[in-house]
Design a protein with these regions (language model features):
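Non-catalytic, mostly N-terminal accessory regions of nucleic-acid modification and defense proteins
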Residues: 1-113, 179-187
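Conserved S-adenosyl-L-methionine
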Residues: 92-187
Length: 187
């Protein structure tokens, strides 16, 4: 396994550009390939040490998320990190709406399969994730699940970091190719 400066060079010069090209090769914006390309077009490698990056990669590689419950636990940790960023005065808080408020909004709107749920300033996509969990709480047919996955949840986000956070949050919740658009809703 490569490490040190060679690993940083590989990530910066080969891996990130390769993943960014997924967007151009994707069949449509509705695919996970397109979303991967968008994500890697928005982010940059923050690691300066290839040794630290190798340690992080080995730690992540040891994690196993086989069940839906384990994946949900990862998404909860992810949202907690976003929340803490905001509480520490960093910009993560502007993308995070407290979960109890989101749950109340979903309970009041009570979305059903076949309806569309839209968040025009989705930030971390917490509202869309909660709506997804609400809709998944019932037994769904294969057709209903396909509708939920591809034709129910929509969002827009203007800021690049929030857009990437929202995409990742939806993927961690189980939405294979989130219908988020990186755009200004009011423009």
């Amino acid at each position: 396994a490569i490490t040190g400066p060679n690993l940083i060079d590989f990530v910066d010069d080969e891996l990130m550009p390769y993943l960014e090209k997924f967007k151009g090769r994707a069949e449509s914006p509705d695919t996970i390939e397109y979303k991967i390309g968008e994500i890697f077009g928005e982010i940059r490698n923050k690691f300066q040490s290839g040794y630290s990056l190798r340690d992080a990669l080995e730690h992540v590689d040891s994690l196993q998320f086989r069940s839906q419950e384990e994946k949900h636990e990862l998404s909860a940790l992810y949202e907690e990190k976003i929340k803490r960023m905001g509480n520490a005065g960093r910009n993560g808080g502007e993308y995070y709406t407290p979960r109890p408020l989101i749950r109340a909004m979903v309970q009041v709107t009570n979305p059903t399969i076949g309806e569309r749920v839209y968040d025009g300033a989705c930030g971390s996509a917490g509202f869309l994730c909660e709506a997804y969990d609400h809709l998944r709480s019932t037994d769904l047919t294969a057709d209903q699940l396909a509708t939920l996955q591809g034709r129910t949840l929509y969002g827009k986000e203007k800021k690049s970091l929030a857009y990437v956070i929202g995409i990742m949050n939806l993927i961690l919740h189980g939405i294979e190719a989130p219908n988020l658009i990186h755009a200004n809703t009011l423009a």
